[in-house]
């Protein structure tokens, strides 16, 4: 049974049926589809479009279908065009001809737009929860490991920071991601139900009622836009892509830090894998997969942008292609956030190796220049002097703080005994606004 066909003389080919069917993936929307139908039926009865007893029969049938799906009694499979057909046909089979009144005053165009908005809202809230869990772990692990470490520019050691402060930089990124998602939720929080195919309905549909019942702020203002809007899907996948970019950056650093060349951290066994030939290997595959899956979400974004780029108003079947990219991007970002939270919460930090790396990198060179500025030298001149000292230290395989005062005075008479306290790593990180890094 199809939900259409009266104006056709010939049967749809089996090839076209298979090509046209979306049940294999839009079955994910069964809960949202039934929830939307329940709201629609209640509104129809309130508006005296269907009778009260008809409403009760339809609601009972819908609730039974939902229960049977949840319990695995009713499998979402078979020769159905989509999830909407599956629900409606099973409803008619269950309660009889009264089930045919379910679709009164509604099109699959506003129905699927509603389903996707409801699913997008729920999915975004799930992503936000995963972000919060990761942010909590970043704070916790940072507070437990507030050790001095090198900060980098161009992947070259630059200045002293702390492990905690470094993790907090990612906390800020994910906090912005959370704000972006919440903003997207506010924008999409308008119900398309009641828009019909594209031009509303001749029935006195109460769109405000269904919008409120389904948790939306208001109904959409324009029917055409209501059924053809997929901006929110593009926007959400775009925001998921930014989250993945942040996760990929963090993954890259964890991969580097866990390598034998750095040895800053150890990634827990639970989030590592081994080699089939090299017994000694412990590979950071969790972080590497997150880094790799970033491109997958970017691909989902490009895919949906390309689908929508030339579509005239209003609904077009091309829009069926919005679902798989969104489902994939949502599932990917959630799994990556969960794995990253696991990696962060179980990693071990090597305090000694962090400090060794600090001492090898002339990370107090800027502070040494600031010292000379405080003694009256212009910064550009101080910059040149310290650069010459660095060359001298490299030739001697020494650090600035290991030079004698006599050696330092070869470069400037402004150096005094207090230079050593000024460029001490633990002391310098608590000077000026560096105190905001919170090292103690």
UniProtKB/Swiss-Prot annotation:
A Gene Ontology BP annotation from the UniProt entry: arginine biosynthetic process via ornithine
GO molecular function, one term: argininosuccinate lyase activity
GO cellular component: cytosol
Catalysed reactions listed for this entry: 2-(N(omega)-L-arginino)succinate = fumarate + L-arginine
CDD domains named among the record's database cross-references: Argininosuccinate_lyase
Cell compartment(s), UniProt: Cytoplasm
Domain of life: Bacteria
Main EC class the enzyme belongs to: lyase
Pfam families associated with the record: ASL_C2, Lyase_1
Entry EC no(s): 4.3.2.1
Keywords linked to the UniProt accession: Amino-acid biosynthesis, Arginine biosynthesis, Cytoplasm, Lyase
Main location: cytoplasm
Protein's UniProt keywords contain Lyase: yes
Pathway info: Amino-acid biosynthesis; L-arginine biosynthesis; L-arginine from L-ornithine and carbamoyl phosphate: step 3/3
Similarity section: Belongs to the lyase 1 family. Argininosuccinate lyase subfamily.
Alphabetized NCBIfam families for the sequence: argH
Protein name, entry field: Argininosuccinate lyase
Organism: Clostridium botulinum (strain Okra / Type B1)
Protein encoded by which gene: argH
């Amino acid at each position: 049974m199809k939900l259409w066909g009266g104006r056709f003389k010939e049967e749809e080919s089996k090839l076209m049926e298979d090509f046209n069917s979306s049940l294999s993936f839009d079955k994910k929307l069964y809960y949202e589809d039934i929830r939307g139908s329940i709201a629609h039926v209640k509104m129809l009865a309130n508006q005296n479009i269907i009778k009260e007893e008809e409403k009760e029969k339809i609601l009972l049938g819908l609730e039974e279908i939902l229960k049977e799906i949840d319990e695995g009694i009713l499998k979402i499979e078979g020769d159905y065009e989509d999830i909407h057909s599956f629900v409606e046909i099973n409803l008619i089979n269950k309660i009889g001809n009264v089930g045919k009144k379910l679709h009164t005053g509604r099109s699959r165009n506003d129905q699927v737009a509603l389903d996707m908005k409801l699913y997008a809202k729920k999915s975004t809230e799930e992503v936000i929860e995963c972000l919060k869990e990761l942010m909590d772990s970043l704070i916790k692990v940072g507070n437990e490991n507030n050790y001095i470490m090198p900060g980098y520019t161009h992947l070259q050691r630059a200045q002293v920071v702390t492990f905690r402060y470094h993790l907090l930089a990612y906390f800020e990124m994910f906090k912005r991601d959370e704000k972006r998602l919440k903003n997207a939720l506010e924008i999409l929080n308008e119900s398309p139900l009641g828009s019909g195919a594209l031009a509303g309905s001749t029935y006195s549909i109460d769109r405000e009622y269904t919008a409120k019942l389904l948790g939306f702020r208001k109904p959409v203002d324009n029917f055409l836009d209501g059924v053809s809007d997929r901006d929110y899907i593009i926007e959400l996948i775009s925001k998921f892509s930014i989250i993945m970019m942040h996760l990929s950056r963090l993954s890259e650093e964890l991969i580097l830090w866990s390598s034998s060349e750095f040895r800053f951290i150890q990634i827990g066994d639970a989030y590592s894998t081994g080699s089939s030939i090299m017994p000694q290997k412990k590979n950071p595959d969790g972080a590497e997969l997150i880094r790799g899956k970033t491109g997958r979400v970017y691909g989902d974004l490009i895919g949906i942008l390309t689908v929508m780029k030339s579509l005239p108003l209003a609904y077009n079947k091309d829009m069926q292609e919005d679902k798989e990219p969104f489902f994939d991007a949502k599932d990917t970002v959630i799994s990556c956030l969960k794995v990253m939270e696991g990696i962060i919460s179980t990693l071990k930090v090597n305090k000694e190796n962090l400090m060794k790396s600090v001492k090898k990198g002339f990370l107090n060179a800027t502070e040494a220049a600031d010292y000379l500025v405080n003694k009256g030298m212009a910064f550009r001149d101080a910059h040149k002097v310290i650069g010459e000292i660095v060359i001298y230290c490299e030739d001697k395989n020494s650090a600035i703080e290991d030079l004698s005062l006599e050696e330092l005075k070869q470069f400037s008479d402004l150096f005094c005994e207090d230079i050593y306290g000024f460029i001490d790593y633990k002391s310098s990180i608590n000077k000026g606004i560096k105190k905001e890094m919170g090292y103690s």
